[in-house]
């Protein structure tokens, strides 16, 4: 019948005119609907008992021809109004996950530095030299003095450029013309931008000398504090100890002489200054230790911040009488603070700190055995080395796995994602969905041959309408009879349904 079909078709397909026409239309359009399949079966007068087999053969042919079988969204029509049809029918379509709208933030453009409100000739010489700035303030008195101050500032700018002492982040763009305003105002250290976007703050303040890299700015700031030698560390530690003693005296003593109280307050304040000095002089030690833990789930600045907390603890606990350098003592506190923070914050799924230590120990032993044996050690070998059971080793290895994002790009171009390769276990196969729709229609046609009460009892007992089976007591309350009477009706109805005249239509759907 179909000249385009080279393979031998099953007789139930080849003898059906409407089904063959449906296949040809599917080849042309690339897809067919489930309702069209049902209408084709009815047009060719295919017995309902053969629908399952014919659908199976049809689905195989469509897969070979590359035709998609679409599931109809419409629910089957019901010819009888059932008593149990109070709750909505069970939906068979898959759940559609609503995509959350992603709002893109406008990237606020950095404020362009506005020209300071001074004469253009004196702008370039204002930043480098403090003495030139002082001369500029005196230059307001007379025009001749102003000219002299400009020349002196220009000479100092040239000298500092030759010595290489200019700031790295000096603006290279030509300053824009601006209206004159008196120097030395409150906004002298800020650059205000008037070209703000609607969603940006009304004013944008840019710190002088700041860059777009916060790590670089931080390293630049802590690099200004000179390092300490051993004698200076001991001296600062003594001042810190005296300050802590003075704070304790002030807190626990109710009645102190005014003179003694003032002296204790001075000593306590001096101890706080010494503590800050010791902290600031050792911030570079934290950076050097934090570099060893980069790439393990935390940002570099976060590692530095956690290490600074450990440094504060080390300053408070340092005992200069032991004779050790402060850096030797502080290293352990900094390292502990960083590792504890990584164990608590680095993972997407938090793992307790004690379990993280077990995971790290297992990883170290596994690397060592890999070098010794030249192969991956078995769980039994690891268990013997770690003094634990093989089951426990496998469990700890599972805890150490890192989750992978479904949006991880694959390939060199990154045109596909990892989630594209994961099978959706809840997805409904189109052929099964069409088969289920046909089963529902046949089931309702069989229930139509029963009385209204019998059909209602069976529907509620097996949850044919809402997917929630009901007990005999619940059905009895609906019909106002006892649970025993409902059991009798159910038994009688099931006997009727087992008769070949009714069961033969549904039996083909069991496999």
UniProtKB/Swiss-Prot annotation:
InterPro entries: RNA_pol_sigma-70_dom, RNA_pol_sigma70, RNA_pol_sigma70_r1_2, RNA_pol_sigma70_r2, RNA_pol_sigma70_r3, RNA_pol_sigma70_r4, RNA_pol_sigma_r2, RNA_pol_sigma_r3/r4-like. Signal peptide: none annotated. Residues 472-491 bind DNA. Residues 357-433 are annotated as: Sigma-70 factor domain-3. SUPFAM superfamilies: Sigma2 domain of RNA polymerase sigma factors (SSF88946), Sigma3 and sigma4 domains of RNA polymerase sigma factors (SSF88659). GO terms for cellular component: cytoplasm. It comes from the Bacteria. Residues 78-93, 132-158 have a biased composition (Basic residues). Homotrimer (Potential). interacts transiently with the RNA polymerase core complex. Interacts with RNA polymerase-binding protein RbpA via its sigma-2 region (residues 211-347) in a free form. This is RNA polymerase principal sigma factor HrdB. The lineage of its organism: Bacteria, Bacillati, Actinomycetota, Actinomycetes, Kitasatosporales.
